[in-house]
Structures are given as structure tokens and as C-alpha cells.
Design a protein with these regions (language model features):
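Active-site helix-to-loop segments that bind/position phosphate- or nucleotide-bearing substrates
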Residues: 1-142
Length: 142
């Protein structure tokens, strides 16, 4: 998919920028290297914000949009994707190269997500998409 190609290119950019060396994104928490561990940890922070955004808006968190019908919480993953590549991905590689502990990485992510008002952005974006989709479905002008 186009999303997968973009993410792969962003991983390469981050790896090259910090001089990380060989990197392969491990699936489902199987990575033992610091960058993979930080990516998993940070992604869960983003998923928490995504779940909060769906709750605030009263949207069903399990609605499958981009992440398909086979994943529970599909909408949460979709909304989390709005901030993961901008905040979590670069911080994972920076923290890995600095030798940060999990708590330091977590704190850096939380500060970046707070500074950028990530939750507000996620809520606003999901709201605009939901209202636009509802208007299209009802035949009203967007």
C-alpha cells in the first residue's frame, strides 16, 4: 500500500539521519533492539490518544476504515496514524541512539504530543472526516 511505502521510507530516513545501522521493523513486539521496543511503546501511547478521540466524539472505536475488518479497534489505529510518524517514529530512533531508558523515551513522547496538541488534532480531524462522510452518505452538500 501507499501507506506502507511511505512508512518504510520514513524509517529509512530516520535510520540514515541518526546513523542507526541495520534496522528491520519487527512485528508484534518481537524486536529486541531499542528502536523497535521504543516504536512499540510509543505506538501504544498514540493508540491511547486515538481511543480517547473516538470516545470524545462518540465514534465506534472498532469501526474498520483503513485498517480493515480483521483488526479490533480499527478506527483507533487509523486515528493514531495521524501522529505516529511525526512524533513517535523520530523519537524512537533519537532515544535509541542516546541510550534512553523507557521512561525517558515515554516522557519525551508525551511532551512532544502535548506540545503539538496531538489529541486536539486527532479529535478535530476525525470530526471533520466523520461529518463529511455523514453528509456524503445523506446526499447533503459537504
Amino acid at each position: 500500500t501507499e501507506e506502507a511505502r511511505l512508512t518504510k521510507a520514513l524509517f529509512k530516513l530516520a535510520v540514515d539521519t541518526v546513523g542507526y545501522g541495520d534496522f528491520t521493523r519487527a512485528k508484534r513486539g518481537a524486536g529486541g533492539d531499542p528502536a523497535n521496543r521504543f516504536l512499540d511503546h510509543g505506538n501504544y501511547l498514540a493508540y491511547g490518544l486515538g481511543a480517547t478521540a473516538t470516545w470524545v466524539l462518540g465514534l465506534p472505536h472498532g469501526l474498520a476504515v483503513l485498517h480493515g475488518k480483521t483488526r479490533r479497534g480499527g478506527l483507533v489505529f487509523d486515528i493514531a496514524d495521524l501522529v505516529k510518524d511525526a512524533h513517535i517514529l523520530p523519537q524512537a530512533f533519537l532515544s535509541a541512539m542516546r541510550g534512553d531508558e523507557e521512561q525517558g523515551f515515554r516522557q519525551n513522547c508525551i511532551e512532544a504530543l502535548t506540545r503539538s496538541e496531538a489529541l486536539d488534532f486527532m479529535i478535530d480531524t476525525a470530526r471533520v472526516v466523520a461529518l463529511g462522510t455523514a453528509a456524503l452518505a445523506s446526499g447533503r452538500p459537504v
